[in-house]
């Protein structure tokens, strides 16, 4: 297959259709308490939509791969064509979506084949800031130091810096340390990708910090390669099995600090996202009398172009699912 220029096709517009369908599917089950159903249905929906693309997309970094109770994304998506890397999170914060809480969204990334580093499904501590803060953060420094560095870079008082953290028991010490320097804290129950996007764009937060998943870290790195910003992440290994899992992904430095260039090796990349419930980054799906309205985001690495989309879907004319 002859390679084509990544610029020849607006892949962001192609994959945003998939995140829209996944979000619409999930929104139909919002608040009904069906946790497995909302996750599986959204995964099936994004699979069907991505399979329409004229690509051969290898799926990378699916956190639910190999779990028999979860609908499995195929190893390859698309109807044939240019070989690509694909990452898909059909429904982030699916527990929140099922319970009717905020910050659920759908994400997809497409890139030139070989551009995205595969990572093990392990815990990763992350620090994320937008481009205005620059490369001032250091994951090896205490949280207070990083908060003060970001405040200085942004020209803000420390008390005016907003730090976004997942509201989890293992973050108690982190939360207390950030509070001790007077910075504002915003806690979210789920949705670390949306939280990181809020910090990258600087719209509702200045810093994201805390533990999450390594596959989500790769997707955040993809977003930064499209938008600018800075990311540091460190995978945590509890035992030899974890280290063996990392080696299967070509990772043999177990103290490595991952940065964007370690996880994304090409600017030929695009990201799309659609909100399911109102969140830190995107508005959720709003149903109307004859359809729905979705809020989405697209960005492209080569041009740093980013778009906000409000799409009106009319189910009476041609239902999309």
Across the structure, where does each feature detected by a protein language model lie?
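A contiguous, surface-oriented mixed alpha/beta subdomain in the mid-to-C-terminal portion of proteins
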Residues: 168-174, 179-210, 214-219
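Short glycine/serine/threonine-rich phosphate/pyrophosphate-binding segments
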Residues: 90-99, 104, 172, 193-198, ...
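N-terminal subdomain of lithium-sensitive/metallo-dependent phosphomonoesterases centered on the IMPase/IPPase/PAP
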Residues: 1-87, 193, 267, 275, ...
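Oxyanion/phosphate-interacting regions
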Residues: 1-2, 199-215, 219-321
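General beta-strand structural signal in soluble alpha/beta enzymes
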Residues: 57-63, 86-88, 97-99, 118-120, ...
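A generic, well-ordered mixed alpha/beta core segment in the N-terminal half of proteins
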Residues: 78-133
């Amino acid at each position: 297959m002859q390679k084509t220029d990544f610029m020849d096709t607006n892949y962001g517009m192609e994959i945003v259709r998939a995140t829209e369908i996944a979000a619409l599917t999930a929104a139909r089950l919002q608040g009904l308490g069906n946790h497995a159903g909302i996750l599986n249905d959204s995964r099936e929906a994004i699979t069907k939509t991505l399979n329409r693309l004229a690509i051969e997309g290898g799926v990378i970094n699916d956190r639910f791969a190999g779990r028999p109770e979860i609908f499995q994304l195929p190893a390859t998506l698309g109807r044939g064509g240019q070989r690509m890397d694909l990452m898909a999170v059909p429904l982030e914060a699916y527990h929140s979506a099922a319970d009717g809480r905020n910050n659920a969204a759908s994400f997809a990334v497409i890139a030139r084949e070989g551009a995205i580093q595969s990572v093990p499904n392990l815990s990763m501590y992350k620090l994320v800031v937008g481009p205005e803060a620059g490369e001032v953060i250091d994951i090896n420094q205490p949280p207070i130091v990083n908060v003060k560095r970001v405040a200085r870079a942004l020209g803000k008082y420390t008390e005016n810096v907003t730090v976004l953290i997942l509201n989890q028991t293992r973050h108690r010490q982190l939360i207390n340390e950030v509070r001790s320097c007077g910075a504002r804290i915003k806690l979210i129950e789920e949705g670390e990708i949306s939280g990181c996007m809020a910090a990258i764009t600087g719209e509702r937060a200045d810093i994201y910090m805390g533990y999450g998943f390594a596959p989500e870290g790769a997707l955040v790195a993809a977003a930064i390669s499209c938008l600018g910003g800075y990311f540091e992440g460190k995978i945590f290994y509890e035992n030899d099995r974890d280290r063996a899992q990392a080696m299967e992904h070509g990772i043999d430095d177990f103290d490595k600090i991952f940065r964007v260039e370690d996880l994304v090796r090409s600017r030929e990349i695009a990201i799309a996202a659609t909100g399911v419930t109102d969140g830190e980054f995107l508005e959720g799906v709003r149903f109307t009398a004859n359809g729905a309205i979705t809020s989405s985001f697209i960005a492209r690495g080569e041009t740093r172009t980013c778009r906000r989309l409000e799409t009106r879907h009319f189910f009476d004319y041609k239902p999309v699912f």
